[in-house]
Amino acid sequence: MVYSYTEKKRIRKDFGKRPQVLDVPYLLSIQLDSFQKFIEQDPEGQYGLEAAFRSVFPIQSYSGNSELQYVSYRLGEPVFDVQECQIRGVTYSAPLRVKLRLVIYEREAPEGTVKDIKEQEVYMGEIPLMTDNGTFVINGTERVIVSQLHRSPGVFFDSDKGKTHSSGKVLYNARIIPYRGSWLDFEFDPKDNLFVRIDRRRKLPATIILRALNYTTEQILDLFFEKVIFEIRDNKLQMELVPERLRGETASFDIEANGKVYVEKGRRITARHIRQLEKDDVKLIEVPVEYIAGKVVAKDYIDESTGELICAANMELSLDLLAKLSQSGHKRIETLFTNDLDHGPYISETLRVDPTNDRLSALVEIYRMMRPGEPPTREAAESLFENLFFSEDRYDLSAVGRMKFNRSLLREEIEGSGILSKDDIIDVMKKLIDIRNGKGEVDDIDHLGNRRIRSVGEMAENQFRVGLVRVERAVKERLSLGDLDTLMPQDMINAKPISAAVKEFFGSSQLSQFMDQNNPLSEITHKRRISALGPGGLTRERAGFEVRDVHPTHYGRVCPIETPEGPNIGLINSLSVYAQTNEYGFLETPYRKVTDGVVTDEIHYLSAIEEGNYVIAQANSNLDEEGHFVEDLVTCRSKGESSLFSRDQVDYMDVSTQQVVSVGASLIPFLEHDDANRALMGANMQRQAVPTLRADKPLVGTGMERAVAVDSGVTAVAKRGGVVQYVDASRIVIKVNEDEMYPGEAGIDIYNLTKYTRSNQNTCINQMPCVSLGEPVERGDVLADGPSTDLGELALGQNMRVAFMPWNGYNFEDSILVSERVVQEDRFTTIHIQELACVSRDTKLGPEEITADIPNVGEAALSKLDESGIVYIGAEVTGGDILVGKVTPKGETQLTPEEKLLRAIFGEKASDVKDSSLRVPNGVSGTVIDVQVFTRDGVEKDKRALEIEEMQLKQAKKDLSEELQILEAGLFSRIRAVLVAGGVEAEKLDKLPRDRWLELGLTDEEKQNQLEQLAEQYDELKHEFEKKLEAKRRKITQGDDLSPGVLKIVKVYLAVKRRIQPGDKMAGRHGNKGVISKINPIEDMPYDENGTPVDIVLNPLGVPSRMNIGQILETHLGMAAKGIGDKINAMLKQQQEVAKLREFIQRAYDLGADVRQKVDLSTFSDEEVMRLAENLRKGMPIATPVFDGAKEAEIKELLKLGDLPTSGQIRLYDGRTGEQFERPVTVGYMYMLKLNHLVDDKMHARSTGSYSLVTQQPLGGKAQFGGQRFGEMEVWALEAYGAAYTLQEMLTVKSDDVNGRTKMYKNIVDGNHQMEPGMPESFNVLLKEIRSLGINIELEDE
């Protein structure tokens, strides 16, 4: 494998054995592609905004004299960029402008004569834009739109599994689900009649819908039944015989023909009898007259002489009727063929319960069901039914729905109309009846072929269409009002409903979620999440066990491991690593094609529907050199089952061993050795890891770390290759390679880094360069590390030296014992940034004022404020300190005219304002790192705001001029090259000032042209600089758009440094979580024979019952990795020659059986080997991919190479006594995470505080500054101790005895330590509640 200069800095040894056929795809493509489809112009009009516009326009007036047509749309440029939107608290969006055409037709003239056409571009609100990382900035906060897994449109056949009716009879049903419009359900009742429901309302006999479609009884019977024909000849009854229909029946008479008896009366008719009848080609048999009694007539029979109806279709025949028919000359009688086995009489029975008899009565019945209480008219009934399923405005199956519909009914074509046809409804009923008759299967609704993904783009389009439809109504009204000659398109359109619909979706939809920004992994997982909840989805309460369970079709599409614990389990899933959605929104996963028994590298993406037809081998099947399967029998999956198949039956093979799991689970090494429940916790807890001060790459990883770090967008990645020309903490400049430049550009890429920004979870986002001056970089190399990344690899925690042993009960029940060294080295120190805002409003009594002049506050409290009353940057503040001084006018008294006069003369009195300053919340302390002041337009800016503005302007100017210098330098170096090539001497050039270079003339025409081009570029560059500076200045100095009534907002950012302490929650990657019980001095920790103490002591009893053995293997492999690092470190310290180092490192990389990674250090320069060794000092990073990891033997070899015991256990000594522990202990390196459940955020104590209004008891919870609840169990405990007075105190004066507690306060102040308990308020509440039941209870004093 070829490594770039940057990748050579640290190479992760890979133990994977299977070749990597397919690279991990870009992990955010599900979000970005979907949104791209939404906003890009689609000439076909299939997707996105274009589709929404085309579905609503043209809008015609009611009279038809005018219409508003859609021409095209364009999205403008956003006003602010992403960072500015976040700072200002606005939405990152672009204005949508639509070109509309108003066409007015001549009234009297023939159809379609145009009188006037007006075209105009109309503003239609703002469309939020997606950032490069797949998020939206809404009102200044980053949000993610989660994809939804919902039931695909189409037709579904299902059964109630015998649960509805007490007899346990299975009732079948069919449901047609459109993309938008009314649902149509068909269902059987226990008596086997077929019913229909529209939109889940009350049921009607299903034949009503057929009558409404204008079918007669005769046509209905003709559609659903085969016929049995009887003929009357010579007073004998003969039946046309179809032998196959007799199967399984018992002969009620002798079946004979041509004098031969085939079946005797009372015998069961078997397949042999049927074969005999078919062989002899028997067409007619004579039947006794009684046989026809009870058969059902298939059509109306009329006496032709009198015109009288003898019997109507669907009537049962009797012998009398037969005689009548015979007399009136009907010799051929058609009856319905039914039997109990596979031709049930369901439709015929349903017609008998159907109260309607023609189309009109059926339409009226449907109208009554849909609009109960309204008097039906013919027109209303007809238009209602027409609009339900046959109008494109109201009903749409969508392309997906039509495809699923036609596939389900086994039709050839998969495209068609979006509305239903007569045939559609009849075919669904036919299939449902077939299923009831025992032919065909019901669908599995949890199959991923029946559930599809709705992503951002599609949901946004639906919301946009909702807004457009609201506008459509208003436009229709306006078009009809007349006076069109003076109106323009923009007078018709009101953009409010559109922007309101879009805003509502992005701001408050259930699927628009506040982004989880704890660390890069939690961002990526949030964007790849798939929820079954949300509008049009399931609800937690109704979702049963089946929906939540893992389904065979999840394989390679949805992760079986990563899902939340709790009420949402199984409803919120994560996309598997290689999964993607197809054009219809179904999930597909890649497979390698197997042709003639050879596994090729050809990749096919299969959806769950297609996958069912193939035999698919697992990724770990052994192949030989040519790609043939080694074993004769291969473990494969087919039709959702796993079994052995011979190797020539295999159609496809998995692409990769990690295909099954999601990104989160694929980061767990040795996942294959962990119990699934613990793996679930491990995958979920990695998302809660807080980025540490110094990221530390995991020694034992899986090889997915780089992909996650790069794709998450927290790192700065080189867009083009080149050389690092300049680097400091906040910017990196790359001089681009000649071959990657666009013609006529400066060839300089500038990357500005994010510094100390607050994330959604209050963690710190900060980027640090990881390249040095002069280094070559290639496209895709990581230039700067973000939070939780180390040299471009995801690094969520720290590698800790752990020992598995009990230690004085300090690791009882999953507690963790930590060495003080961990605190000293700041291994788990994290930085949290809090934003505190102070809002100054305009009140009824006058404006609030931000000032340092606060009543009744001492000098000390104001020491950290400047003259504007705002805290200095860099001030260290603790709980209760004032950050922003603010006073609010107090209007307690109405002033007399005299006082008003005195006020006016002598100025304001200080007493009429109250202090409402912003203070640091209790229990928080930190350093002020930034202050921002936002002032409303037209309000005078204070001194501090002007200072901040000036600073920002200075910074912007500095940044831009530095940028200009860098670009100029790049340009002039090219100008110089052209001049020198054109024959100007270099020395002469260097003496001239640079500006004069462009005035030189060259004889070579081509070179002169180049020079002129460069001169043009130089002018453009300067012009661009001026423009940018002006735009920046305008943005910085303009007033802010604040919400009504707000004059000023001051935001203060506090950085809080949190060291690890007892009570903090930590975890490994295998679901092994615990709380720190004690920070132990280094000298008391167990140490080994070299005197090295361990960092963390874990309880060995936490392993066997939880079955997460992965953590032990990780510990051993971590030890080996560290051992090799130690040996390299020793060699570096002894300054051994490069050849020896190279040889040792090469040995380490070559270790392991048949590993896919080949690292050839002979191609590395000495300098590169030294740098690699330098980076391997702390341990050699190792990748052990999921399901394809390091074997036990390989771990032992690696331990041997690092001169460590192969058992992975060493002798430890007690740090306090120096005695050896009695048996060897497992010691190694485990990757530990500090989770975002910090004791600082949870610890809380209350002295006095607010009370609940009704019960007068203290509030609960830290946010309300509440008290600790003394609940019933605690009361029982005090009762058990007999501590009556303590209990009385708890229930009265310390809780809700209002008078008692005020007296208590007085007594304490007076030094009189006695209490006088009274009546608790909650008892009064109880009395009131009993009175509300009409029982009067009064307390009487004795």
Swiss-Prot record:
UniProt entry tagged with the keyword Transcription: yes
Any GO molecular function: DNA-directed RNA polymerase activity
Lineage top rank: taxon: Bacteria
Annotated coiled-coil segments of the chain: none
PROSITE patterns (alphabetical): RNA_POL_BETA
Similarity comment text for this entry: Belongs to the RNA polymerase beta chain family.
Protein name according to UniProt: DNA-directed RNA polymerase subunit beta
Native species: Escherichia coli O6:K15:H31 (strain 536 / UPEC)
